[in-house]
Structures are given as structure tokens and as C-alpha cells.
Amino acid sequence: MNDGNKIKLELYPKVAPNTVNNFISLVKKGFYNNTIFHRVIPDVNPGPPMIQGGDPQGTGMGDPGYFIKGEFTINGFTNNLNHTRGVISMARAAQPYDSAGSQFFIMVNDCSYLDGQYATFGKVIEGMEVVDKIAKTERGAQDRPLQEQKMKKVTVDTFGIEYPEPEKISQ
């Protein structure tokens, strides 16, 4: 984060392989560097308690120029990782299901009604207090933080494993 705090994730390629390939590919390209968490919903607010980022425009409308297949149950893909505290999942449009690209959200608390509807693919293993702090920041219209919550640099350690480019769907 811009303030020096860190959020460390563990990714689960066996749960959502193409989603993980996509995330790693974007990280390696520096796509997420200097992007913001443009939407934050604390647990006390209606809606899923989460922080959302990964949009190069910072508006909630940006993407990498392509989509990926949604790896979740209602889209015909078995993904049993539930939306519990700390889980990371891909954001997408309501329709079509295959509309995820780069935006993701991290759960602040459990939200079972999202299970099977979004592609979960990892979990926060360090820095959940940073997620909580971001979620509690003062918000304006469309749950946008009044003070910018910027990801200064996003890195990935694949521990020597090569991950292929994701399978992409044209827009």
C-alpha cells in the first residue's frame, strides 16, 4: 500500500486455475501497481462486506481489455472456496457470467450469499488488519473512499512454478 502496509495473499490454482493464471499474469505485468481500492463496504453496511480494487481507471468500470471465464458454480464450474473473511474473489458484471477481467474483492467478513456466484481464488494470509482499516475508511458516493487507498506495488512469488497466460475471452 502507499502507506507502507502490506496485504499478503495465498493463491489457490487448484480451485480456480485460469483465474489464478490471470491474476499472476496481471501482477507480473505491473497492471495493479498504483491502482486503488475504489469501493469499500464495511460490515455494518448493507451489501457484501469487502474492499474492491484492480480497476486501472479507478472507477469500477475498467478492465485489462479482455474477459476470462467465470470459475464458479452457477457458471458450470466447481469452486468450493466460500466467501469467508479474507477470501479474494473476482468482480464481474451481473451478466454475462464470463465478464471478469482484473477487478477483485477481498472479503471483510463471511458472505455466504456470494458463494457459487463469483470466482474465489485465494485468501489473505497476512495483513488482514490492513484490509479492515481500508474497509473502515470514510466513504462517499458508490462506497468510494474519500481518501485514496492505493496499492503502490503488487508482486507475486510463484516459488519457481511457471503459470501460463490465462485463456481470454474477447470483449
What are these regions (language model features)?
Residues 1-171:
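Cyclophilin-like peptidyl-prolyl cis-trans isomerases
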